[in-house]
């Protein structure tokens, strides 16, 4: 008689792989746009795990497209140069000097760090700015008044991304955009990622954040709502139940669904291997939003 207990660790690992099988089959050849931000970018260990998740996704047939932020690094660089920065309703006032620093940090530092880390982990990542081949076309965002070189994405040159995917590369995109006036614009990374996802008709749009997901009870971090329909998400937003930084993230997910993305996810990037757990397990670890959701449906 074989003593199963002797192989309990190995069996549990095999069970995880078997659980992932229908998801691997479902998403083979699909596109997932992942906004890489929050604590996942600050903690070196978590950052490495995210890179591992991204590379594994690629190897099992899902095509990840990475869009990253970099607010804390930009703040740090501006402070070191004694350049004052102001915000209006979450948008950075961006004059020409600030824009120069934003581009330097996003494109020259963070983008290259993420690209190098993915390559070191075994992937084939290519770092891009939204200015490359007019990847992200922006116009001035005047929603909060004239804040300088703050833009909103009005067009995505999807062919650039699709050509890279076809050749098995992983695009890593910094959210600096080009305007019709040939000026550089600072664009919100979450919104840019959503625009990229919709332009690619992505199956998945994932926001890596510093919160567990959408909560039933704001005082209870364990009360994550694992699945929301599009209608439920809109109702929550309109009910003013959602507050703070979750409002723009939920709006971003809703807009992505309206623009053709099949599934949007808000997950806690502080959880080790959160991407794999959300996409390739039945339960997931965050909140999935879809036009329609069904019981036990994480596909």
UniProtKB/Swiss-Prot annotation:
<dbReference type="InterPro" id="IPR036393">
    <property type="entry name" value="AceGlu_kinase-like_sf"/>
</dbReference>
<keyword id="KW-0418">Kinase</keyword>
<comment type="function">
    <text>Catalyzes the ATP-dependent phosphorylation of N-acetyl-L-glutamate.</text>
</comment>
<dbReference type="GO" id="GO:0006526">
    <property type="term" value="P:L-arginine biosynthetic process"/>
</dbReference>
<comment type="pathway">
    <text>Amino-acid biosynthesis; L-arginine biosynthesis; N(2)-acetyl-L-ornithine from L-glutamate: step 2/4.</text>
</comment>
<dbReference type="InterPro" id="IPR004662">
    <property type="entry name" value="AcgluKinase_fam"/>
</dbReference>
<keyword id="KW-0067">ATP-binding</keyword>
<dbReference type="GO" id="GO:0005524">
    <property type="term" value="F:ATP binding"/>
</dbReference>
<dbReference type="InterPro" id="IPR041727">
    <property type="entry name" value="NAGK-C"/>
</dbReference>
<feature type="binding site">
    <location>
        <position position="92"/>
    </location>
    <ligand>
        <name>substrate</name>
    </ligand>
</feature>
<dbReference type="Pfam" id="PF00696">
    <property type="entry name" value="AA_kinase"/>
</dbReference>
<keyword id="KW-0808">Transferase</keyword>
<keyword id="KW-0547">Nucleotide-binding</keyword>
<dbReference type="InterPro" id="IPR001048">
    <property type="entry name" value="Asp/Glu/Uridylate_kinase"/>
</dbReference>
<dbReference type="InterPro" id="IPR037528">
    <property type="entry name" value="ArgB"/>
</dbReference>
<feature type="site" description="Transition state stabilizer">
    <location>
        <position position="249"/>
    </location>
</feature>
<dbReference type="GO" id="GO:0042450">
    <property type="term" value="P:arginine biosynthetic process via ornithine"/>
</dbReference>
<keyword id="KW-0028">Amino-acid biosynthesis</keyword>
<dbReference type="GO" id="GO:0005737">
    <property type="term" value="C:cytoplasm"/>
</dbReference>
<dbReference type="InterPro" id="IPR001057">
    <property type="entry name" value="Glu/AcGlu_kinase"/>
</dbReference>
<feature type="binding site">
    <location>
        <begin position="70"/>
        <end position="71"/>
    </location>
    <ligand>
        <name>substrate</name>
    </ligand>
</feature>
<keyword id="KW-0963">Cytoplasm</keyword>
<protein>
    <recommendedName>
        <fullName>Acetylglutamate kinase</fullName>
        <ecNumber>2.7.2.8</ecNumber>
    </recommendedName>
</protein>
<feature type="binding site">
    <location>
        <position position="186"/>
    </location>
    <ligand>
        <name>substrate</name>
    </ligand>
</feature>
<keyword id="KW-0055">Arginine biosynthesis</keyword>
<comment type="similarity">
    <text>Belongs to the acetylglutamate kinase family. ArgB subfamily.</text>
</comment>
<dbReference type="GO" id="GO:0003991">
    <property type="term" value="F:acetylglutamate kinase activity"/>
</dbReference>
<feature type="site" description="Transition state stabilizer">
    <location>
        <position position="35"/>
    </location>
</feature>
């Amino acid at each position: 008689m074989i003593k199963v207990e002797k192989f309990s660790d190995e069996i549990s690992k095999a069970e995880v792989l078997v659980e992932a099988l229908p998801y691997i089959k479902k998403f083979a050849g699909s596109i997932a746009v992942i906004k890489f931000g929050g604590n996942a970018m600050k903690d070196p260990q978590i950052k490495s795990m995210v890179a591992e998740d991204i590379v594994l996704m690629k190897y099992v047939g899902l095509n990840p497209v990475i869009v990253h932020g970099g607010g804390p690094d930009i703040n740090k660089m501006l402070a070191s140069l004694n350049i004052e920065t102001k915000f209006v309703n979450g948008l950075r006032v961006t004059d020409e000097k600030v824009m120069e620093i934003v581009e330097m940090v996003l494109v020259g530092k963070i983008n290259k760090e993420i690209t190098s880390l993915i390559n070191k982990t075994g992937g084939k990542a290519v770092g891009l700015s939204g200015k490359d081949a007019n990847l992200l076309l922006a116009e001035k965002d005047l929603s909060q008044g004239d804040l300088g070189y703050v833009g909103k994405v009005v067009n995505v040159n999807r062919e650039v991304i699709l050509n890279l995917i076809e050749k098995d590369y992983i695009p890593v995109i910094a959210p600096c955009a080009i305007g019709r006036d040939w000026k550089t614009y600072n664009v919100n990374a979450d919104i840019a990622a959503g625009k990229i996802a919709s332009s690619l008709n992505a199956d998945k749009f994932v926001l890596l954040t510093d919160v567990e997901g959408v909560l039933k009870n704001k005082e209870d971090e364990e009360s994550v709502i694992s699945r929301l329909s599009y209608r439920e998400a809109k109702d929550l937003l309109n009910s003013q139940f959602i507050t703070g930084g979750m409002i723009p993230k939920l709006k971003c997910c809703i807009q992505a669904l309206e623009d053709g993305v099949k599934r949007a996810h808000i997950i806690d990037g502080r959880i080790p291997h959160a991407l794999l757990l959300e996409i390739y397990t039945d339960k997931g670890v965050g909140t999935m939003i879809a036009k329609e959701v069904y019981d036990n449906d994480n596909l």
